[in-house]
């Protein structure tokens, strides 16, 4: 839970200040989209190998390695903001993405193992911890706007805190989670790209496109297309993260009652309604309501798809493969929406 909560803290504190990032780096919206994609590219690169790595060393060691790479990347992000360098910022985002990808697979394999031991859905609550961390980060980012805190200092402080806490608590984690099963050692665990894994991957691709759009562009969309002030945009992002947190916290019980598929269908319809409210561009309060429903729509996709992947044989590699589909979506989404948004407006 600690790993889940800290991995999104720093990034969400940055997302609510993306308009300022654009100004500090002196770049266009389209260029910002390309720079943001560096993180997803790094995550994709890490996911190509992380399944085998986790199976070899276990989730405890791979999680610490991932967080260490993540820390290095976000230190570079802070430096890039301090000196106004888009290149350093992008390189840091790339390494931060690699570290996040390695850590993400490690903690989701752990989460799936816990679910199987409990015999009930637990992954949504773990992803709720991630949402709590991102909500806290969004709140801290909004507070930083109010007190005019230097953005590089903000990122540096939160990066350090987010790294030291999981490193300290890692000593209490089991060291054998995620290691090769007897079937894998004997080479009888079967192929990674099964029909189920591909279908799960396609599903998570679509849903993470919607989630990535909300994380990367909601604040800028409210500023540019609603003429909202930075604080109102930050509130909109915080509402989105809050709704995701609430749904993930209670999503386990809902999933146990309705099943994964029906739960995703219901929340998905609500998410579409939220997007319609945002696209209508009526006023800021309705945009906030749309942000809330958007969060409801995307909240359970990642935990439930990865939970299903973790139920398959060879879980570390299956989770890594399905995660790769999700990060591919994050890879495609930011630049695509950035260039289209520059031409016709982010909300459009």
Identify the function of each model-found stretch.
Residues 5, 73, 85-103, 287-299:
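Hydrophobic core of transmembrane alpha-helices in multi-pass small-molecule transporters
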Residues 21-22, 53-54, 143-148, 222-223, ...:
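Interfacial helix-cap and linker-helix signal at transmembrane-aqueous boundaries
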Residues 152-171, 348:
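Symmetry-related core transmembrane helices of the 12-TM Major Facilitator Superfamily/SLC fold
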Residues 60-63, 264:
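Primarily marks hydrophobic transmembrane alpha-helices of the MFS/SLC 12-helix fold
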Residues 68-83, 270-282:
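C-terminal ends and interior cores of transmembrane alpha-helices
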Residues 16-30, 216-232:
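Short amphipathic helix-loop junctions that connect adjacent transmembrane helices
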């Amino acid at each position: 839970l600690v790993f889940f909560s800290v991995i999104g803290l720093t990034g969400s504190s940055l997302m609510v200040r993306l308009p300022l990032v654009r100004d500090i780096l002196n770049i266009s919206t389209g260029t910002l989209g390309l720079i943001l994609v560096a993180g997803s590219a790094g995550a994709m690169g890490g996911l190509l190998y992380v399944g085998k790595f986790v199976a070899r060393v276990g989730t405890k060691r791979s999680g610490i390695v991932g967080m260490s790479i993540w820390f290095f990347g976000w230190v570079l992000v802070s430096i890039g903001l301090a000196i106004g360098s888009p290149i350093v910022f992008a390189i840091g985002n790339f390494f931060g993405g690699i570290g996040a990808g390695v850590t993400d697979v490690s903690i989701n394999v752990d989460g799936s193992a816990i679910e199987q031991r409990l015999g009930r859905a637990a992954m949504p609550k773990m992803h709720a911890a991630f949402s709590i961390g991102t909500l806290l980060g969004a709140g801290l980012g909004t507070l930083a706007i109010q007190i005019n805190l230097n953005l590089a200092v903000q990122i540096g402080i939160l990066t350090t805190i987010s790294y030291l806490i999981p490193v300290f608590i890692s000593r209490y984690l089991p060291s054998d989670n995620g290691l090769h099963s007897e079937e894998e050692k004997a080479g009888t665990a079967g192929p990674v790209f099964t029909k189920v894994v591909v279908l799960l991957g396609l599903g998570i691709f679509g849903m993470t496109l919607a989630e990535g759009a909300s994380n990367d562009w909601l604040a800028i969309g409210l500023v540019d297309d609603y003429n909202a002030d930075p604080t109102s945009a930050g509130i909109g992002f915080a509402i989105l993260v809050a709704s995701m947190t609430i749904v993930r916290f209670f999503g386990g019980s809902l999933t146990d009652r309705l099943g994964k598929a029906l739960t995703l269908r219901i929340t998905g319809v609500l998410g579409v309604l939220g997007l319609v409210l945002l696209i209508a561009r009526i006023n800021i309060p309705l945009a906030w309501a749309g942000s809330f429903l958007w969060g409801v729509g995307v909240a359970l996709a990642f935990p439930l798809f990865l939970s299903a992947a973790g139920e398959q044989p060879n879980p570390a590699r299956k989770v890594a493969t399905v995660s790769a589909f999700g990060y591919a979506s994050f890879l495609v989404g930011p630049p695509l929406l950035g260039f289209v948004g520059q031409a016709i407006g982010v909300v459009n």
